[in-house]
UniProtKB/Swiss-Prot annotation:
Primary gene name: NLP4
Domain of life: Eukaryota
Reported function: Probable transcription factor.
Record-level GO cellular component terms: nucleus
Region entry Disordered, spans: 641-709
Name used for this protein in its record: Protein NLP4
Statement: the UniProt record of this protein carries the keyword Nucleotide-binding: no
Length: 844
């Protein structure tokens, strides 16, 4: 008797436990291979797990939907699809709905709309439901006779609701001719879509765009709705606002909470344990990447630079994830981005919220190739091609370039670095120059990163083909990956810019001639096909820095001192062009040979001093004519050329060649590089009688001779100045430089958008100049900044020492305004592993 009492008590306790367990609903799943729908007959009349006994069993739920008035049409096909597609899963798993009075999906959708109205943070919004129905033998989405809600005080939303009722969109995957519209894309893709302003849509993307403009509606969010545990899309909830919707997360979270309240859901799913990565070693490269992006933005005034990586790699969840696309989804690394322009910070936040699929935008395209991807205007993309195109349009961003790099720590973690060009850089020629400058930044690629080789790209393509992965389709897009590099000329870019596919703008990184060659990075994004191979650096699987160093070493060995001497007469820039290297490389080679300054650069400094003396002499009345001091400077190249020619003749085989007639080069054509080295080429002409010196005459001798003559002339001029200064009766009203002008410098400094003017004593010390400027701009540590001056050729030249300041003053004294124009920028010298080989291009 006691046993039966205890037994009945245990039954009551078990029933209470089960009631509590099933109160909110749960899943049952078999583990021994059996199936719920194939349960063996039981001796009892009713099975304890009879599917018909559950309030929200799949069969019962869908049958109720299919017989519910107008809404019955929207699930007629889904009932069949669910029984066929999910049959195996439903046999293994079963959903037990929560206790209490059951409600159909239709009722819950109505409740969801009411909940969204209460949960949403937006005021002045229209909430409407789009559901699939059968119409004319086709499945279409409609909002007619479906639940909706809007602000009763806003007539614009009421008008837009009446307009939306008259629209329907295709709900069939194979119906390519019909317009899907925003609700159709969300329903078919099972992914949410949002825009800060629907007015940015094209009419083929959003057929209601003209009505939206008339009704003055802005931000729009559309999300798919699912049942718990099901992948069948029940419909689409669209939220239309009268204000711009910049941030997605607040509204999305509100809608998701409203759906969960009625046991529905949207697309945001927890990361499946099987897809969670455990290798976070890629984070070791993030500090170097951050520094790389910072240097690029501060050097070239870029508004934004971002780092993209796969969501799977960083275990990141998002609203655009589902089981099918998770491995193709990419997102930004929030702590590896740099915002150079505070006005685009919200755009960066939107990028962080809105993940991309590989193939979307320049960043998504870069994941599918091993070269850079460039677009002259990302705001021209369709929404399906680049979901953030409307945000780019809103914040005035146009040009963008991205390149894919691989982490050597893991061998599989890929980063895509995305750079947005300045907002005012919208001209194609300006963009080309900016890309040319940005390409030099890639010479600073950290040693922990490398590019993807062609072989690795081929292997990835084979895997994609085997798995039959479908990436977002981009109409008329060029092939994004393959063995052939994607190159385009400037004319092709201009033609492509007139189309709606800015992704056709060419890639300029090209592979090697052989399959095993490294991956070439050309000096600058050169759109011409005749790039000089000597001006290229090489990426390889071992990292850019190592290969670039090997290539530099090989090039340096082939340029001897004798080769350099042949070009001493001209400018350093001309010499670099003739030799086939960049000016910075030539300067490094000169330093290896003990040449600290290009010879004509030295003589030019002396020329500036002589010109200053000449001005002083000319300003004194009573002096009969100027002294001919300019002839020494002008004749310097002739002296070198005269010594150079016999040396060349001695090396040639008989008979000796006829005298060479050199063409005239522009007079005093100056060129300044980033480290303040300057070159000049003066007017030269070599006649037939200029080769009379013996062949043994050395170029160094000519240099010494010229230098001695100049020193002698300078010495005599100094004596003349001393004599003139000792005169007691100098006529009044002379143009002699006043002591005030001699003691003070007029300086104009630009720092970003700020400009200051100042006068300071002529100490000609760089330290004093930096201190004075730092005091005006309230900068404590001036070592983190670079200071440049504008020379007579309108080029910015870096000030690095007191000698540079002296030359800067001498040069600026020759200008009519006698004002020194300076530019203050964030220094790139704090950049790790910066090589002198890229200094010139960085400031070019």
């Amino acid at each position: 008797m006691e046993d039966s009492f205890l037994q009945s008590e245990n039954v009551v306790m078990d029933a209470d436990f089960m009631d509590g367990l099933l109160l909110d609903g749960c899943w049952l799943e078999t583990t021994d291979g059996s199936e719920f729908l194939n349960i063996a007959p039981s001796t009892s009349s009713v099975s304890p797990f009879d599917p018909t006994s559950f309030m929200w069993s799949p069969t019962q739920d869908t049958s109720a939907l299919c017989t519910s008035g107008v809404v019955s049409q929207m699930y007629g096909q889904d009932c069949v699809e669910r029984s066929s597609l999910d049959e195996f899963q439903w046999n293994k798993r079963w959903w037990i709905g929560p206790g209490g009075g059951g409600s159909s999906v239709t009722e819950r959708l109505v409740q969801a709309v009411e909940h969204i109205k209460d949960y949403t943070t937006a005021r002045g919004s229209l909430i409407q439901l789009w559901v699939p129905v059968n119409r004319g033998g086709k499945r279409v989405l409609t909002t007619k006779e479906q639940p909706f809600s809007h602000d009763p005080l806003c007539q614009r939303l009421a008008n837009y609701r009446e307009i939306s009722v008259n629209y329907h969109f295709s709900a069939e995957q194979d119906d390519s001719k019909a317009l899907a519209g925003l609700p159709g894309r969300v329903f078919l893709g099972k992914l949410p879509e949002w825009t800060p302003d629907v007015r940015f849509f094209k009419s083929e993307e959003y057929p209601r765009v003209h009505h939206a403009q008339d009704c003055d509606v802005r931000g729009t969010l559309a999300i798919p709705v699912f049942e718990q545990g099901s992948k069948i899309c029940l419909g689409v909830i669209e939220v239309v606002m009268t204000t711009e919707m910049v941030k997605l997360r607040p509204e999305l979270e509100s809608i998701c909470r409203a759906l969960q309240a009625v046991d529905l859901r949207s697309t945001e799913l927890p990361i499946p344990p099987s897809l969670k990565g455990c290798d976070l070693s890629y984070k070791a490269a993030l500090p170097e990447i951050r520094n790389l992006l910072r240097c690029a933005c501060e050097t070239h005034k870029l508004p934004l630079a971002q780092t993209w990586v796969s969501c799977q790699q960083q275990n990141k969840s998002g609203c655009r994830h589902n089981d099918e696309n998770y491995i193709h989804c990419v997102s930004t690394i929030d702590d590896a981005c740099y915002v150079g322009d505070p006005t685009v910070r919200e755009f960066h936040e939107a990028c962080s919220e809105h993940h991309l699929l590989k193939g979307q935008g320049v960043a998504g395209q870069a994941f599918l190739t091993n070269g850079p991807c460039f677009s002259s205007d990302v705001s021209n993309y369709k929404k399906s091609e680049y979901p953030l195109s409307h945000h780019a349009n809103m914040y005035g961003l146009h040009g963008a370039v991205a390149i894919r790099l691989r982490c050597i720590h893991t061998g599989s973690a890929d980063f895509v670095l995305e750079f947005f060009l300045p907002k005012d850089c919208d001209d194609l020629e300006e963009q080309r120059k900016m890309l040319n400058a940005l390409s030099t930044i890639m010479a600073h690629v950290p040693r922990s990163l490398r590019t993807v080789t062609d072989k690795e790209l081929e292997e990835e393509s084979e895997v994609i083909e085997r798995e039959e992965i479908v990436t977002p389709k981009i109409e008329n897009a060029s092939e994004l990956h393959g063995n052939s590099p994607w190159n385009a000329s400037l004319e092709e870019i201009q033609r492509s810019n007139n189309t709606s596919n800015p992704q056709n703008l060419g890639l300029v990184f090209d592979g090697g001639d052989k399959p095993n060659d490294g991956f070439g990075l050309k000096r600058g994004f050169d759109y011409t096909m005749d790039s000089n191979v000597n001006e290229s650096s090489t990426f390889s699987s071992g990292g850019f820095s190592m290969m670039a160093e090997k290539k530099r070493t090989k090039a340096d060995k082939t340029i001897t001192l004798d080769v350099l001497r042949q070009y001493f007469a001209g400018s350093l820039k001309d010499a670099a062009k003739n030799i086939g290297v960049c000016p910075t490389t030539l300067k490094r080679i000169c330093r290896q040979h003990g040449i600290q300054r290009w010879p004509s650069r030295k003589i030019k400094k002396v020329g500036h001093s002589l010109q200053k003396i000449q001005r002083v002499i000319d300003s004194v009345q009573g002096v009969s004519g100027p002294l001919p001091i300019g002839s020494f400077y002008a004749n310097f190249p002739n002296l070198v050329s005269q010594s150079q020619e016999p040396s060349q003749q001695a090396k040639t085989t008989p008979p000796p060649p006829p005298p060479v007639q050199l063409a005239k080069s522009p007079v005093s054509s100056y060129s300044h590089s980033s480290n303040s080295s300057q070159c000049c080429s003066s007017e030269t002409q070599l006649n037939s009688g200029a080769t009379t010196d013996p062949p043994s005459t050395d170029v160094g001798g000519a240099l010494k001779k010229t230098s001695s003559e100049i020193e002698l002339q300078s010495s005599s001029l100094d004596e003349t100045i001393l004599t003139l200064s000792s005169l007691e009766n100098i006529p009044q009203g002379t143009n002699l430089l006043s002591s005030q002008d001699d003691d003070f410098l007029r300086i104009k400094v630009s720092y970003g958008e700020e400009k200051i003017r100042l006068r300071m004593r002529n100490s000609r010390r760089l330290r004093d100049l930096l201190w004075e400027i730092g005091k005006r701009f309230s900068i404590e540590d001036m070592s983190r900044y670079d200071l440049k001056y504008l020379d007579e050729d309108n080029e910015w030249v870096l000030l690095t020492c007191d000698e540079d300041v002296e030359e800067c003053v001498d040069v600026c004294r020759t200008t009519p305004s006698h004002t020194i124009k300076l530019l203050l920028q964030a220094s790139s010298h704090h950049f790790p592993e910066r090589s002198s080989a890229t200094e010139y291009s960085l400031w070019h």
